[in-house]
Swiss-Prot record:
Pfam families: HHH_5, RuvA_C, RuvA_N
Region span, Domain II: 64-142
Cited SMART domains: HhH1
Region annotation (Domain I) ranges: 1-63
Gene that encodes the chain: ruvA
Main location: cytoplasm
Name this protein carries in UniProt: Holliday junction branch migration complex subunit RuvA
Taxonomic lineage of the native organism: Bacteria, Pseudomonadati, Bacteroidota, Bacteroidia, Bacteroidales
A single GO cellular-component term on record: Holliday junction helicase complex
Biological process, per Gene Ontology: DNA recombination; DNA repair
Subunit structure: Homotetramer. Forms an RuvA(8)-RuvB(12)-Holliday junction (HJ) complex. HJ DNA is sandwiched between 2 RuvA tetramers; dsDNA enters through RuvA and exits via RuvB. An RuvB hexamer assembles on each DNA strand where it exits the tetramer. Each RuvB hexamer is contacted by two RuvA subunits (via domain III) on 2 adjacent RuvB subunits; this complex drives branch migration. In the full resolvosome a probable DNA-RuvA(4)-RuvB(12)-RuvC(2) complex forms which resolves the HJ.
Coiled-coil regions, chain positions: none
Domain text: Has three domains with a flexible linker between the domains II and III and assumes an 'L' shape. Domain III is highly mobile and contacts RuvB.
Amino acid sequence: MIEYLKGAIVGLTPTNLVIECAGVGYDVNVSLTTYSAYQGKKEGLIWITQLIREDAHLLYGFSTKEERTLFGQLTSVSGVGPTTARLILSSYAPQELAALITTGQADALKAVKGIGLKTAQRIIVDLKGKIQLETSSDEILSARTAVGDAALNTIASGEEAISALKMLGFADPAIRKAVKSILSEDSSLAVEDIIKRALRML
């Protein structure tokens, strides 16, 4: 199994990263958190989870071991597959997600596409005692009220956000309506922030 890949980053979108190692290019599925970590970088090391199926060999990559661990923990929960786990990690940063699970915020988890109330509750029951990430009192307080949005970046790309959301399986009309609404409130949002907000609306 592949532990990590290290090399030149030759392609990067909010959902995928292409990394070249020894002349071979690997297409890696990533979350928004990992996408943000590699923006503007020409080289990097990405931690890998490899899923082997009859019809495909899939790579999921993470900027930290902690995010990879969370991905593995999420996919160990009945009803949570790799696509849903990536959506959860795209909606909430690792520390944010750890705070949600620690404080039992099922409604916040339920806001993610593909997560119903029963699955959200199952995630909390199964993982509450397993989460190892440190969560500060401020993060827990934020989770108990409403999870704070990620820090805003400078320039947003609505079309890139729309394209990424399509790749995640959402319908075009609903995507455009959500993105338009988000940008009408704040046109300076970075693409990952647009997507995070849209994921909570779709």
